């Protein structure tokens, strides 16, 4: 299976250095953070016996928060906008810039390994809406068709603070500002809802759009996991779509912990656990996401 891989332009480099005593623990070293690219050169001057180490992390690709650009077919409810290589995040003026920056960084890094998947999602118009911490889900215009009565408004405002694809738009995902920023009123504490909801778009729009056999592969893994007794009593067994999104959360160390399983979650909430518990799914996810 041939895939286009991505060589990133920029990285965050954390340099750990000590010019005198190399026997120190790394966390005790002098540290410095740099933004570098593949052509950068770093000069180090170390005394005899000195030591250093470097950690490289992908640097998100994004612009700055602006008003809605002219020519964009975006509802007038939205006043803020930020973009990462064609994918955009938007919100009303009541949402902090910090939340939009965080959302943009997340989607940039999630797609950093597969530019072909990202390009297809850009072509389809994929985007993210952030629900303000003081806004209700039904305030967003995309939800008007399901928030069309007092009962439905009350239900959806209670039911969820984020969706991936349906019911609003198969090319959009949404999440709450309070979850992005881990604010006290977050009802999903311990999880990152954007990673879950955006994983649905990556799956259903991006990957399936460039790999027509992907859903067959995913369904086979989902059925096999169920037959092995994996994910019993969790949301991941609902269908192949939730299996993918829940496992992506665990891959990125942002799923909620429950032991025993509580009908939604179990104890497999982190990457190292997922790798040991469901190695075939872990292997699949590595095709699309950096470890």
Model-predicted regions and their roles:
Residues 15-39:
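Solvent-exposed beta-strand/loop surfaces of large extracellular or lumenal domains
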Residues 91-94, 230-238, 268-274:
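Active-site rim elements
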């Amino acid at each position: 299976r041939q895939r286009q891989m991505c060589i990133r332009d920029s990285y965050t480099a954390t340099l750990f250095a000590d010019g005198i005593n190399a026997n120190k623990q790394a966390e005790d070293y002098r540290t410095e953070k740099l933004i570098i690219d593949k052509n950068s050169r770093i000069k180090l001057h170390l005394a005899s016996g000195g030591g250093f180490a470097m950690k490289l992390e992908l640097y998100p690709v994004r612009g700055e928060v602006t008003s809605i650009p002219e020519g964009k077919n975006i509802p007038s409810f939205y006043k803020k906008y930020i973009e990462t290589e064609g994918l955009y995040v938007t919100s009303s003026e009541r949402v902090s810039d910090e939340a939009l920056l965080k959302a943009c960084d997340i989607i940039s890094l999630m797609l950093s390994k597969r530019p072909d998947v990202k390009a297809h999602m850009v072509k389809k118009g994929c985007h993210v809406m952030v629900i303000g911490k003081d806004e209700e889900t039904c305030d967003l215009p995309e939800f008007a068709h399901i928030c069309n009565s007092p009962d439905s408004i009350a239900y959806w405002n209670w039911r969820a603070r984020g969706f991936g694809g349906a019911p609003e738009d198969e090319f959009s995902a949404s999440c709450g500002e309070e979850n992005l920023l881990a604010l006290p009123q977050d009802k999903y504490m311990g999880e990152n809802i954007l990673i879950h909801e955006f994983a649905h778009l990556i799956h259903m729009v991006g990957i399936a759009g460039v790999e027509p056999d992907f859903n067959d592969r995913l369904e086979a893994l989902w059925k096999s996991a169920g037959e092995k007794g994996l994910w019993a009593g969790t949301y991941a067994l609902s269908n192949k779509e939730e299996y993918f999104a829940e496992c992506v959360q665990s891959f990125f160390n942002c799923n909620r912990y429950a032991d025993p399983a509580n009908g939604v979650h179990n104890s497999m909430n982190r990457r190292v656990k997922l790798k040991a518990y469901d190695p075939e799914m872990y292997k699949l996810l590595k095709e699309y996401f950096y470890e």
